[in-house]
Structure formats: structure tokens, C-alpha cells
């Protein structure tokens, strides 16, 4: 049901937009169905997918050109899909030995057209010199035998080995099973595997939200290096935060395991003063939300972290030099937190930009959230779907087709052209997918308005 509903994100071999559509159409129910999808969704056999789906959904429409084909093609609803089926056709209809039939399989897989075309006579009429009786001698009508061989010739252009397809389909099935029955664990592992690619992570985060899984912000007291599973959802991994390397994350986790979670921002600065934590990493941890657990505004922490880290480093040096007496140590321990300035919190837009710049993702929200009802009514196309359609040669989107897209402008660059007009290159991003647009317009004839 999951695959048939198009929820294929993260499923091996099945997550592209085009093959997701095939899954929705075919409604796969077994490994055999997945094997056929993997074998058919390629440039050659893709044209036969509609016939395959129609035959699967309407088995009463399936016809065989000779009864002998039913036992060979029933598993693929009357369609030739695999090289192994061709072997059986040569054996059962043409009377070939297994070795002779396998030789034809090799010729087909290597696309030896001359050999394949020359073999028609032997398949239909037989070849006594090689002990091949032929299809007619085995009770197949001459016209039907020639039509079957024509289909074999067509098949030679996209022949696929079933053993290979089954191997792919088995992994597809396993990953689909894990996603269906262990969604949090699977999606956490999946995002960890691509955490260096923010665009892929963004796509999987969108899939998590569609699945009803909550993405928990990075947390200095809970996050580990990888994405991890918690009762409330999936916790963002600290290693995905820019300028926070895995070595530093390991030091943070080791400190938590040794002495418990950090009770305050001051304590964090003190306890991590001898690690690889530098000011750039600290700033990024604050901006991505990893310090929200201390109950302070991000705007406040951004104003005090520099001095707090400097003070912590000085205290550590004095402690090593024996310059801190017992009274001052006790006083430091009794101070629960650094005094915070009375400033307003960052505006939502600035907060989301901070998350984007430090993780490559919008975490606590998306700038487009307020516009989604309007975008849905406007039938806005997904940039990711458009790019996938062109990459796979599908016809859902085509050159010169007019589509409506919406997103956040990530960058804009202008330059004059040779004819004196102005050209702009704009990088637009919707939910995690970026694309570049080139706009050209005449000087003095632009009517631009800024929207916020």
C-alpha cells in the first residue's frame, strides 16, 4: 500500500518522480511486481509499461499468441520482460537445447542483431543440422511464430537479466519494509547517510513530515553526531552543522556521558573550554537552535557567547596555573548562569536564515509556509519534479511548456549584455530544490516591486 500510494522517498531504486508514478499505476503487491518495475523502468522498455500495468490491473485482457506462452509469461502478465523468458521461449516453442537457447540469450544481451535476425528461420521452421525442430513442428502457427520472433527482436533492444532485477528488487523490498515498519529508525539512518548533502536531507525531511514524523532541532544536550531516534521524533545530528566537525561532536558527547548534560550555558562554556569548540562553531550551534535547551533567546546568546568563551578559557588557564583559590572556585560554581541582556528574540525570518546558513536547511519553519494555501490554489509546480522529469526523459514537463514555480531567491547576479540590455541570474529554491533562471530585460523598462 505504501508504494502504491507513491510514498517511495528513500526506497532503493524507487524514489525518483517517474518510477514513483509507475508504482502508483502498478500498485505492486509482490517481489515479482517490484522486479518487473526495476526491469521495465529503463529507456528501452519504458514504452511497454502502460501495457504491462493495464494487463496487471485487467488480467481478462491478457492474450497469448500460443498456449505454450502462458506458463512462461503469466508472471509478467503476457509481456516479455526478462532474458530468462526468452530462453524458455526458444526451448519450449523452438525446441532448442538449454545451451542453444542460452547462446541466443547471450546474442540478445550483447545486441548482436545479425545473429538474432539470421536465427528467425531456425526458430520458426527448424534447423535439422543443429537438431532444432522449430516452432511449427511444436504446434505453433507459422504467423504466430513470426510475430513472437518479432517481439523477441524488439526485446533485444532492452534485454534485462532477471537475476539482476531480482537483486535490485530484493533491496527495494527490504528498504520499503524497513521504512514502513520502522519509519523513524529508517529515516534517521537514511538522513545520516546523506548528511553531507543538504539538498538530499531536505528532501527526506519533507518526506518525514508527510509521514507524520517530527524533526527535532539540534540540541547540545541530546544530539549525537548522526540523526538519532527519540520518542518524540528524529533528532538532528550535530555533525550536519557547518563548522562543527565529528571530532568536536565526539568530545561533546563524551563530556555529556562523563558528567551528565550541561546545566547552563555558563557550565557548557566551562566544561568545553578544553575541547575543539571555537567561536565560529559556537555561533553556528546557537544559530541552528542547538542551545535553545537553556531557555535563552538566540539573540541573547549571540551577544554573550564571545565573552563567555573568553572567560571560560581564562578561568581554565588560571586553574591550571593554580591562581584560583577555593573561595573563587566555590563562587564560580554557585553562579548558575551568565547575565543575559534584555533584547528581543530574532525575527522569524532571521531565525530561519540562521538555520539555513548553518545547516543548509530551514528547520523550525520555511519562509514559504505562510504562502502554501495560495501556492496550492495556483497549481505551482515543484522544481524537483521538473528537474527529475527532464533528467529521466519523461513527458510530464517539456521544453517551452509554461509552468508556475515559487520559492525563495537564494542569490541574484546581474550583468549587462552586448546589446545593452541587462541580464540577471537568479537561484530559486523551493522545499530544498534549487534551480537557476536567466532573465533578460531592457534598461529603463523594468517594473520591480519588493515583497516581504
Show where each model-derived region lies.
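Noncatalytic, beta-rich nucleic-acid-contacting surfaces in large DNA/RNA-processing enzymes
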Residues: 1-452
Amino acid at each position: 500500500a505504501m508504494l502504491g500510494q507513491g510514498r517511495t522517498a528513500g526506497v532503493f531504486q524507487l524514489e525518483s518522480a517517474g518510477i514513483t508514478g509507475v508504482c502508483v499505476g502498478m500498485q505492486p503487491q509482490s517481489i515479482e511486481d517490484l522486479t518487473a518495475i526495476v526491469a521495465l523502468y529503463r529507456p528501452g522498455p519504458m514504452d511497454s509499461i502502460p501495457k504491462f500495468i493495464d494487463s496487471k490491473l485487467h488480467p481478462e485482457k491478457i492474450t497469448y499468441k500460443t498456449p505454450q506462452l502462458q506458463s512462461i509469461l503469466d508472471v509478467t502478465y503476457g509481456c516479455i520482460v526478462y532474458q530468462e523468458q526468452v530462453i524458455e521461449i526458444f526451448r519450449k516453442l523452438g525446441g532448442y537445447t538449454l545451451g542453444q537457447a542460452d547462446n541466443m540469450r547471450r546474442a540478445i544481451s550483447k545486441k548482436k542483431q545479425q545473429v538474432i535476425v539470421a536465427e528467425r528461420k531456425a526458430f520458426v521452421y527448424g534447423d535439422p543440422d543443429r537438431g532444432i525442430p522449430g516452432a511449427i513442428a511444436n504446434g505453433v502457427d507459422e504467423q504466430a511464430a513470426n510475430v513472437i520472433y518479432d517481439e523477441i527482436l524488439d526485446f533485444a533492444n532492452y534485454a534485462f537479466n532477471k537475476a539482476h532485477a531480482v537483486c535490485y528488487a530484493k533491496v527495494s523490498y527490504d528498504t520499503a519494509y524497513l521504512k514502513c515498519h520502522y519509519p523513524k529508525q529508517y529515516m534517521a539512518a537514511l538522513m545520516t547517510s546523506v548528511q553531507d548533502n543538504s539538498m538530499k536531507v531536505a528532501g527526506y525531511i519533507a518526506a518525514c513530515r508527510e509521514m507524520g514524523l517530527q524533526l527535532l532541532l539540534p540540541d547540545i544536550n541530546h544530539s549525537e553526531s548522526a540523526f538519532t531516534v527519540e520518542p518524540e521524533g528524529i533528532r538532528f545530528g550535530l555533525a550536519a552543522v557547518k563548522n562543527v566537525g565529528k571530532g568536536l561532536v565526539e568530545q561533546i558527547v563524551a563530556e555529556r556521558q562523563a558528567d551528565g548534560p550541561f546545566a547552563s550555558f555558563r557550565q557548557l562554556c566551562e566544561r568545553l573550554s578544553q575541547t575543539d569548540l571555537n567561536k565560529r562553531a559556537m555561533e553556528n550551534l546557537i544559530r541552528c537552535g542547538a542551545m535553545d535547551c537553556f531557555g535563552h533567546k538566540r539573540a541573547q546568546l549571540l551577544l554573550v557567547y564571545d565573552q563567555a568563551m573568553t572567560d571560560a578559557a581564562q578561568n581554565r588557564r588560571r586553574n591550571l596555573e593554580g591562581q584560583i583559590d577555593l573561595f573563587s572556585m566555590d563562587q564560580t560554581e554557585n553562579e548558575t548562569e551568565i547575565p543575559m541582556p534584555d533584547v528581543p528574540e530574532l525575527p522569524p525570518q532571521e531565525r530561519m536564515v540562521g538555520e539555513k546558513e548553518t545547516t543548509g536547511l530551514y528547520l523550525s519553519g520555511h519562509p514559504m509556509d505562510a504562502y502554501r494555501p495560495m501556492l496550492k490554489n495556483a497549481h505551482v509546480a515543484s522544481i524537483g519534479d521538473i528537474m527529475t522529469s527532464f533528467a529521466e526523459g519523461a513527458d510530464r514537463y517539456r521544453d517551452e511548456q509554461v509552468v508556475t514555480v515559487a520559492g525563495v531567491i537564494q542569490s541574484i547576479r546581474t550583468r549587462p549584455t552586448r546589446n545593452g540590455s541587462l541580464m540577471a541570474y537568479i537561484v530559486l529554491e523551493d522545499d530544498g530544490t534549487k534551480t537557476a533562471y536567466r532573465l533578460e530585460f531592457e534598461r529603463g523598462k523594468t517594473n520591480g516591486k519588493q515583497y516581504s
